[in-house]
């Protein structure tokens, strides 16, 4: 009788549909063998960017931009002014539209050398690009990171143009440092965009909670790695550790800031 019950149970189980792990953006591209280990963060359900439709904005020409962008007046400094306008010309030339199927939701400023978007580079360049907001909504560059947030709050620091994360989330180089709130606060202080603040708040809170859970030591300080901080050319770990890939069992000051 017991054998019969077990046999029926096994046959019934085999007819059930297989549960597919929630995608993290890489599954179909790289056929990752990982099991679903997500502990879902409720704040992620408030992330509107994960379900937003892509919005492509085609920028105007650089000649048109010169009529809109801040026009500095600095007598006797023609070379400096030439550099200023050249910086804007380069920036405008690097505006990209989201690829179809990438999961990106906004046209963005591409700051990298390889076609990927970088959390570190994007956050800092937007502190400059915000002065061109009347010409183009550069701040929306960060929307693409928010759109690729994982169910547990993680956001990869480097994402390919096709939307695929470059690193598994528990890799020591996978994310950080947490510069996006700083970038958003600078933007808010200048423009007072409360609507954007309300939208990004749960996203950034969920990411902060993930970092606090997964990138801190027992005393509450944070760790990172050379690539994780964007400072792989500033070796600081003991010689037995990789200056690029390892946390070196150290407290990383720039990650704690």
Predicted regions and their residues:
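Active-site acid/base region of carbohydrate-active enzymes
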Residues: 68-89, 132, 145, 150-154, ...
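The substrate-binding groove and active-site-proximal loops of carbohydrate-active enzymes
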Residues: 119-120, 124, 163-171, 188-198
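Bacterial Sec-dependent N-terminal signal peptides
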Residues: 1-22
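Low-complexity, Ser/Thr/Pro/Gly-enriched N-terminal "stalk/linker" regions
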Residues: 22-117, 140
